[in-house]
Regions:
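Acidic, His- and aromatic-enriched active-site or binding-groove loops in soluble protein domains
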Residues: 59-60, 91-98
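Short, well-ordered beta-to-alpha junction loops that form the rim of enzyme active sites
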Residues: 38, 74, 125
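Histidine-centered catalytic micro-motifs
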Residues: 68-76
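Short glycine/proline-rich turn/loop motifs
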Residues: 4, 88-92
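Active-site beta->alpha N-cap acidic-glycine motif
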Residues: 1-68
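Conserved, mostly hydrophobic/aromatic
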Residues: 8, 72, 123
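Catalytic domains of cell-wall/extracellular-matrix polysaccharide-remodeling enzymes
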Residues: 96-125
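Short, flexible, mixed-charge acidic loops at enzyme active sites
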Residues: 77-89
């Protein structure tokens, strides 16, 4: 059996207790998930506790162990009331913005990840 697991909204100040519980389950099952890291989180709803000081190194280690890293948006701030191509919501960080603005946000986020040793070619919103 093949299993794919995707974890979104990964930030230095997420709920680390909940993340640890999920990580334990995944480790016990031998599953290496795709984790979507928000490069420059500005979403107050994702601020759950103090930032983990070794966040970037921690996820570089997980990447070395087989976890896949994705860029999950840029700041996680919804700036439009657009649903995009697959409208699950009527708001978005990217949908409805100009190509140039979206490209700038993607490149900026990618550079943040790269500067912390997490180079990836996977992008998800």
């Amino acid at each position: 059996m093949r299993i794919a697991v995707r974890l979104d909204d990964i930030t230095p100040d997420m709920d680390w207790e909940k993340f640890g519980e999920v990580k334990t389950l995944l480790d016990n099952a031998g599953v290496c998930p795709l984790v979507g890291i928000v490069p420059d989180n500005k979403d107050p709803n994702l601020h759950k506790q103090e930032s983990k000081k070794d966040f970037w190194r921690y996820f570089a280690t997980l990447k070395d162990k087989g976890w896949s890293i994705a860029q999950h948006g840029y700041t996680h701030i919804y700036t439009t009331k657009e649903g995009g191509l697959f409208p699950l919501n009527d708001f978005s960080e990217f949908a409805g913005l100009s190509y140039d603005k979206q490209l700038y946000m993607i490149k900026s986020g990618k550079e943040i990840l790269r500067s912390h040793g997490l180079d990836t070619d996977i992008f998800m919103t």
